[in-house]
């Protein structure tokens, strides 16, 4: 498959466009998503440059924010089907190590990505992949700021 691969931390030149990168294989609780759209955000730049205290495994495929279609299911995946349109929540909450898709595991700057089923968000038919790919980190940042800085409480309107 084609992928934008970071082989070492550095400037923009450290990203290599690979045309024969191995296709991902799903673990039992994962799906393979054919990426329909991906966007870049500040965290992708941090992943490329390197971040103090976070060891990013190399080579790395960045891309936290992406959306696409499920094309393969791991054997334990329930409630999802081939052809389902999904957006990805990049925060890995189900593992003690945590981390992000596109940081500690391959992300969406590739044709295909293995994604834990817990990180899938059903995408309505009237929302484009491009629009959905703009949401995860930007939305998560805005939501967190509403709670932490704005101290918005349940029932309040913004």
Predicted ranges, named:
Residues 43-49:
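Cytochrome P450 core scaffold surrounding the K-helix E-X-X-R motif
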Residues 2, 30-32, 157:
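Residues that mark the start of a beta-strand
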Residues 7-11, 38-40:
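Short polar catalytic/cofactor-binding loops
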Residues 12-18, 51-52, 140-144:
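Short gly/ser/thr-rich secondary-structure transition/capping motifs
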Residues 14-17, 53-56, 96-102:
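A short, acidic/glycine-rich surface segment
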Residues 22-39, 51-92, 124-127:
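Glycine-rich beta-strand-centered segment in the early N-terminal region that forms part
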Residues 89-158:
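NAD(P)H dinucleotide-binding glycine-rich loop of Rossmann-like/cofactor-binding domains
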């Amino acid at each position: 498959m084609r992928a934008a691969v970071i082989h070492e931390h550095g400037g923009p030149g450290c990203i290599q466009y690979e045309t024969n990168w191995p296709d991902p294989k799903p673990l039992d609780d994962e799906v393979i998503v054919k990426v329909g759209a991906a966007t870049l955000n500040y965290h992708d730049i941090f992943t490329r440059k390197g971040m103090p205290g976070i060891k990013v495994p190399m080579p790395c495929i960045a891309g936290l924010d992406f959306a696409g279609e499920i094309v393969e299911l791991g054997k334990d995946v329930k409630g999802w089907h081939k052809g389902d349109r999904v957006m990805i929540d990049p925060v890995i909450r189900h593992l003690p190590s945590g981390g992000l898709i596109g940081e500690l595991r391959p992300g969406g700057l590739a044709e295909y990505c293995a994604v834990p089923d817990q990180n899938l968000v059903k995408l309505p038919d009237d929302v484009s992949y491009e629009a959905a790919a703009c949401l995860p980190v930007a939305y998560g940042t805005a939501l967190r700021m509403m709670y932490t800085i704005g101290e918005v409480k349940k029932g309040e309107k913004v």
